[in-house]
A protein has these predicted regions:
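PLP-dependent aspartate aminotransferase-fold enzymes
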Residues: 1-75, 89-93
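Active-site-proximal loop/turn and secondary-structure-junction residues that shape catalytic pockets
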Residues: 30, 79-81, 112-116, 144
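Short acidic, glycine/serine/threonine-rich loops at helix termini
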Residues: 36-40, 84-87, 118-123, 149-152
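C-terminal, well-structured subdomains that either form a transmembrane helix-short loop-helix hairpin
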Residues: 71, 75, 80, 84, ...
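Active-site C-terminal subdomain of aminotransferase-like
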Residues: 121-124, 128-171
Length: 171
């Protein structure tokens, strides 16, 4: 998605875009599996230290970290240290402004590995899911709640077009 957008925006061929290194903005509270993505896909991790008082990243920090090479922002719903939720709605609002101002298409992935089966049942939470315009995908882990083998997890995309043709497989 990003490479096609970047090529079109900068009048480049697909081959010319291959040398560009995209980045993902996220909290330093990320799960270790993200390291594999960064290494295997040659993506620069733009890591934000969470606030020492809330242990969440702030929308202003995200705004300062994104640029035209940003392929996404990861918001964590239930970090591994204290279970805190990043302020997805606030980050979505900041990205709305940035995307409109700069003609970017930065989306949000909600890493709800730890909070994905808790947050939907909390009535007092601000929107954090597909109700927000920039949330493109949400992941959750089944193995954290028992009843499944280690490593069981799911990811759901809002729209088929946001899932890379290299990832989707029809059987």
């Amino acid at each position: 998605r990003w490479r096609k957008w970047f090529a079109k925006k900068n009048n480049l061929s697909d081959e010319e875009v291959l040398g560009k290194r995209p980045n993902i903005v996220m909290s330093t509270c990320y799960q270790a599996a993200w390291e594999k993505l960064f290494k295997y896909m040659d993506i620069e991790p733009r890591l934000i230290s969470p606030s020492s008082s809330s242990f969440k990243i702030e929308a202003e920090q995200v705004a300062a970290a994104v640029d035209e090479y940003t392929i996404g922002v990861v918001c964590i719903m239930g970090n591994h240290y204290g279970g805190q939720y990043d302020p997805v709605a606030e980050i979505d609002a900041v990205l709305n402004d940035i995307n409109e101002k700069h003609n970017f298409q930065i989306g949000i992935h909600v890493d709800a590995a730890s909070g994905g089966f808790i947050a939907p049942f909390q009535d007092d939470l601000p929107a954090w899911d597909f109700r927000l315009a920039n949330v493109l995908s949400i992941s959750a882990s089944g193995h954290k709640y028992g009843g499944s083998v280690c490593g069981t997890g799911w990811v759901v995309w809002r729209k088929r077009k946001d899932l890379s043709e290299h990832v989707a497989i029809s059987v």
